[in-house]
């Protein structure tokens, strides 16, 4: 099924985006990413190692693959920090596709500070960045981010790394209805069925890291996520049947043997 995910000027053949944290080494990160079929991997700017070419670099590990890098501003708590981070990153790498995240609660929930995120988005969009904005599952804030110049909205399903799955499915639907941008469900995905559910709700894609990296068999989970996202997307596009309170016979009664 040819169904490209378009984010700004970029087109991706896979609707699954993966993270790069929590793996034992860069090689395992690469193997799991390739098993997932993802064409986009998000990585904290500090792990891109843009200041010391003599240290191990994740980008070198992925040379020769079709995987693109999505730098993120993990650890930033103000708009100014995120803006500076991405300016330096683009200057060093030429990468303009970014995952903007400004964290409001760094101790317990890792929930985003959406007000600071909007401030950063307004400035970075004017500077030509292609912005995928991590946010809460609030449809009003999603619309504000669209107005601020975001190219994709990334609402959380649940707290980062929690594995709780989609806690507010109606909010994901409301966000999908509120914006005319790709909606990528981000954070809280725990297993393949969570990813499929997100896609069935109408999400344009899913981002997951911990569910793969923390699985007992990361390679198998990566492949499961690949198929789950495809299946969920196909299910959504197919159009599910209406829910009814009573049974509906699937076989006609005409022609039955008369007793």
Swiss-Prot record:
GO terms for biological process: thiamine diphosphate biosynthetic process. Its main location: cytoplasm. This is Thiazole synthase. SUPFAM superfamilies: ThiG-like. Its EC number is 2.8.1.10. CDD domains: ThiG (cd04728). The keyword Cytoplasm applies. 1-deoxy-D-xylulose 5-phosphate binds at residues 161, 187-188, 209-210. Coiled coil: none annotated.
């Amino acid at each position: 099924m040819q169904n490209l995910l378009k984010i700004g000027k970029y087109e991706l053949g896979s609707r699954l985006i993966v993270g790069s944290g929590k793996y034992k080494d860069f090689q395992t990160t690469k193997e799991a990413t390739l098993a997932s079929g993802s064409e986009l991997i998000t990585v904290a700017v500090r792990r891109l190692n843009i200041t010391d070419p003599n240290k191990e670099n994740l980008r070198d590990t992925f040379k020769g693959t079709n995987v693109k890098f999505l730098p993120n501003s993990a650890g930033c708590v103000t708009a100014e920090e995120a803006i500076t981070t991405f300016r330096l990153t683009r200057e060093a790498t030429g990468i303009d596709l970014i995952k903007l995240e400004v964290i409001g609660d760094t101790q317990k929930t890792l929930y985003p500070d959406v007000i600071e995120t909007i401030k950063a988005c307004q400035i970075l969009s004017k500077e030509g960045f292609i912005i995928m904005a991590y946010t809460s599952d609030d449809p009003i804030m999603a619309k504000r981010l669209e107005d601020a110049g975001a190219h994709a909205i990334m609402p959380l399903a649940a707290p980062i790394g929690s594995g709780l799955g989609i806690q507010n499915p109606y909010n994901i639907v409301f966000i999908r209805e509120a914006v005319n941008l790709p909606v990528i469900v981000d954070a809280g995905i725990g297993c393949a069925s969570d990813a499929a559910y997100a896609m069935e709700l109408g999400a344009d894609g899913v981002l997951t890291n911990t569910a793969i990296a923390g699985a007992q068999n990361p390679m198998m989970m990566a492949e499961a996520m690949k198929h789950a996202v495809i299946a969920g997307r196909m299910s959504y596009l197919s159009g599910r049947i209406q829910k009814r309170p009573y049974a509906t016979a699937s076989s006609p009664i005409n022609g039955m043997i008369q007793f």
